[in-house]
């Protein structure tokens, strides 16, 4: 009888819902090709507002939703701190980041790129400095990549 009874719920409800979540892009490694592959993920905005860099790296440590992808970050790695200074994120990781890494230059580069590409998706970030247990100048076991440099996104 009354067409108004069929009206869909007010628009605000979806907007509230959308405001609570945000789409982030995380970079994982394709298990077969070993290439870096982006994966979109909806996450709680609250986490992005309180600890954006730590939140994103912790998501990178977890396994991706897509079964063809895998985390580029070594198992057991913990984020000890993440702080923006200027436009560079100082990312402090636990020793497992070095100790548990599978090694090999390609795998090491993929690990660095996964972190850098994920964090530089945020407008305020142009580079990442990696610390291990608060210390600079650490390196992977292969010694191909030293962490003394600030890593920037390679297009």
Give the residues covered by each predicted segment:
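Bimodal "functional hotspot" detector
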Residues: 1-155
């Amino acid at each position: 009888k009354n067409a108004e009874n069929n009206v869909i719920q007010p628009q605000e409800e979806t907007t509230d819902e959308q405001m609570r979540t945000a789409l982030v892009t995380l970079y994982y490694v394709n298990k077969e090709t070993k290439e870096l592959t982006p994966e979109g993920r909806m996450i709680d905005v609250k986490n992005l507002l309180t600890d954006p860099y730590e939140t994103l790296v912790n998501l990178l440590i977890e396994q991706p939703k897509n079964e063809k992808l895998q985390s580029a970050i070594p198992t057991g790695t913990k984020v000890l701190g993440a702080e923006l200074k200027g436009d560079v994120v100082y990312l402090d990781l636990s020793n497992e980041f070095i100790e548990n890494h599978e090694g090999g230059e390609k795998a090491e580069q993929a690990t660095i790129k996964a972190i850098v590409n994920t964090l530089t998706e945020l407008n305020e970030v142009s580079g990442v400095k990696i610390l291990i247990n608060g210390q600079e100048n650490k390196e992977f076991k292969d010694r191909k990549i030293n962490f003394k440099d600030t890593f920037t996104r390679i297009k």
